[in-house]
């Protein structure tokens, strides 16, 4: 039902970078949006924590009473861009219960509670849209739920965190170490004061959970996603990567796997990996994002663009708002959520990939054969070995660095090998263990 036959009432929760841009678009593009929707949008109110703060909008639109705002009879659609998970969850559930369609960009909430929110929307016969939650302005949710609805998605992978991609791109192009590249990202506003969620892979894991759930029609939460961060990557790793014709990216990978018993499983993981320069993802630099979808009939599709920031994210939010508003005008709903099967998750130990292992060792005869023996004991086949001298600040040779590239091996076998290498007297330390993706096993 319409609150008014001539308008679609909108409430915006949150007036940060994204919320401010959404309000600007609603007001600045009012005529264009009305033409696309079939009725004008009317901004009914904006939920904020502190009404007294000057925010550059009419004060009579501001309220700190979120519950009252989302239950108003003249509000048809609630746009949630607040951030805090529990506060957002309560507001969205309340809005849905009051018959409001909801647009949200809250990836952390969706990664934990997509099922709960989707069921609430279904029960209330309203829409729940969240295109902006995964990759900012990049359209990937709608292609998965609509364009590929008749296909079988086999794999979804890519780069969905602009902060880490900027840091790794800077390390690759300038030779900077991690701390220097992080400082540069902070100076440009790409990294938060506390970058943990980005650099330890939490942000990418939440997005991977959302995409895996949609792509494979199963419930995946952020806790189901195996995760590693980028804080241990060194300039030496980039030197070795370039020698191998690769660069290093923080990837998310979600894929459908058929286990030995014939049962289908889902693997979802986030980690830094070597990517061949010939792969499309290797060219995604700076704060840009990209998602590659592989489907049975459609083949490989790639989506690229700005994955974060106020304006790009607001673009996706407003796109969802237009879709929800059109449905209100027509008295219809968007596509219903698929019926979900609870496919089991594949543990990381059974996932087979190629590996890059770097270690500092004593510079003496027999070391290489001892290292190779540890790989052989666990049936981890070596594809390539590189050895170089290590010198101190005075140019005196003080040891050697060995880089081993393997053929396909399970994570479990490789982990056992690394533990054994660390126990060898001649190994001073295993400095890096990275996977190689986009390379045939």
Swiss-Prot record:
Q: Which UniProt keywords apply?
A: Amino-acid biosynthesis, Metal-binding, Methionine biosynthesis, NAD, NADP, Oxidoreductase, Sodium, Threonine biosynthesis
Could you tell me which InterPro entries the record lists for this protein? ACT-like_dom_sf, ACT_dom, Asp/hSer_DH_NAD-bd, HDH, HDH_cat, HDH_CS, NAD(P)-bd_dom_sf
**What does the record say about how the cofactor binds?**
A sodium ion is seen in the structure; a metal ion may subtly affect the relative position of the nucleotide-binding region to influence enzyme activity, and could increase the stability of the enzyme.
| Residues forming the catalytic site | 207
Give the EC number.
Answer: 1.1.1.3
Q: Which residues cross the membrane?
A: none
What is the top-level taxon of the source organism?
Bacteria
Pathway(s) annotated for this protein in UniProt: Amino-acid biosynthesis; L-methionine biosynthesis via de novo pathway; L-homoserine from L-aspartate: step 3/3; Amino-acid biosynthesis; L-threonine biosynthesis; L-threonine from L-aspartate: step 3/5
Q: Is NAD given among the entry's keywords?
A: yes
Task: Supply the SUPFAM superfamilies for this chain.
Answer: ACT-like (SSF55021), Glyceraldehyde-3-phosphate dehydrogenase-like, C-terminal domain (SSF55347), NAD(P)-binding Rossmann-fold domains (SSF51735)
Question: Which part of the chain is the ACT domain?
Answer: 356-435
Q: Where does NADP(+) bind?
A: 17-18, 49-50, 107, 189, 192, 309
Task: Give any Pfam family that matches.
Answer: NAD_binding_3
Tell me the residue numbers annotated for binding Na(+).
131, 134, 136, 138
GO biological processes: methionine biosynthetic process; threonine biosynthetic process
Listed Gene3D superfamilies = 3.30.70.260, Dihydrodipicolinate Reductase, domain 2, NAD(P)-binding Rossmann-like Domain
Q: Does the keyword Disulfide bond apply?
A: no
Q: Which CDD domains match?
A: ACT_HSDH-Hom
Q: Which reaction does it catalyse?
A: L-homoserine + NADP(+) = L-aspartate 4-semialdehyde + NADPH + H(+); L-homoserine + NAD(+) = L-aspartate 4-semialdehyde + NADH + H(+)
Q: Where does NADPH bind?
A: 18, 49, 107, 309
Family classification? Belongs to the homoserine dehydrogenase family.
Q: What does this protein do?
A: Catalyzes the conversion of L-aspartate-beta-semialdehyde (L-Asa) to L-homoserine (L-Hse), the third step in the biosynthesis of threonine and methionine from aspartate.
Question: NCBIfam families from the entry?
Answer: PRK06349.1 (NF004976)
Put simply, this protein is called: Homoserine dehydrogenase
Q: Whose protein is this, by species?
A: Mycobacterium leprae (strain TN)
